[in-house]
Amino acid sequence: MYPAHLLVLLAVCVSLLGASNIPLPSLDFEQFGKMIQCTIPCEESCLAYMDYGCYCGPGGSGTPSDELDRCCQTHDNCYAEAGKLPACKAMLSEPYNDTYSYSCIERQLTCNDDNDECKAFICNCDRAAVICFSGAPYNDSNYDIGTIEHCK
């Protein structure tokens, strides 16, 4: 396991906030962080992912720089799809008020059956991202790569 994976939390969250073409569904930073900690225990700061690759951080464009950056791109795209669901429309206006229900048992994440359609979709976006992060190495050379030059 790669202890730096917890750092993905902030990058993904900032990426969602900074991308103008991605609607913002329910996003509970603490909840997503706990999901990451369930699968990838770590006590490191999120700052190393604030400017990682082309998608882990504010905005997102171009070709992902590596597997980890593809995880961030996929997560961004998943949230964009959530924004198209009729069930998510009401949630989009109050993105921080609702959280989904999930469980973490022996480092296994499960989105619970009591979620409504939108919460279930978002929970599965986050779950898939965390699983992706857990299998993707952190490449120091993709930190602060200069998105203007490398992410076209």
Swiss-Prot record:
Cofactors named for this entry: Ca(2+)
Cystine residue pairs: C38-C104, C54-C151, C56-C72, C71-C132, C78-C125, C88-C118, C111-C123
Tissue-level expression: Expressed by the venom gland.
Residue ranges of the propeptide: 20-27
Source taxon at top rank: Eukaryota
Keyword hit for Lipid metabolism: yes
Range of residues in the leader sequence: 1-19
UniProt GO BP: arachidonate secretion; fatty acid biosynthetic process; lipid catabolic process; phospholipid metabolic process; positive regulation of fibroblast proliferation
Record EC number: 3.1.1.4
Cofactor binding mode and count: Binds 1 Ca(2+) ion.
GO molecular function terms attached to this record: calcium ion binding; calcium-dependent phospholipase A2 activity; phospholipid binding; signaling receptor binding; toxin activity
Catalytic activity entry: a 1,2-diacyl-sn-glycero-3-phosphocholine + H2O = a 1-acyl-sn-glycero-3-phosphocholine + a fatty acid + H(+)
Catalytic site: H75, D126
Entry's localization field: Secreted
GO CC annotation: extracellular region
Pfam families, per the entry: Phospholip_A2_1
Binding site for Ca(2+): Y55, G57, G59, D76
Keywords annotated in UniProt: Calcium, Disulfide bond, Hemostasis impairing toxin, Hydrolase, Lipid degradation, Lipid metabolism, Metal-binding, Platelet aggregation inhibiting toxin, Secreted, Signal, Toxin
Reported function: Snake venom phospholipase A2 (PLA2) that inhibits collagen-induced platelet aggregation. PLA2 catalyzes the calcium-dependent hydrolysis of the 2-acyl groups in 3-sn-phosphoglycerides.
Similarity remark: Belongs to the phospholipase A2 family. Group I subfamily. D49 sub-subfamily.
Protein name stated in the entry: Acidic phospholipase A2 S17-58
Upper lineage: Eukaryota, Metazoa, Chordata, Craniata, Vertebrata
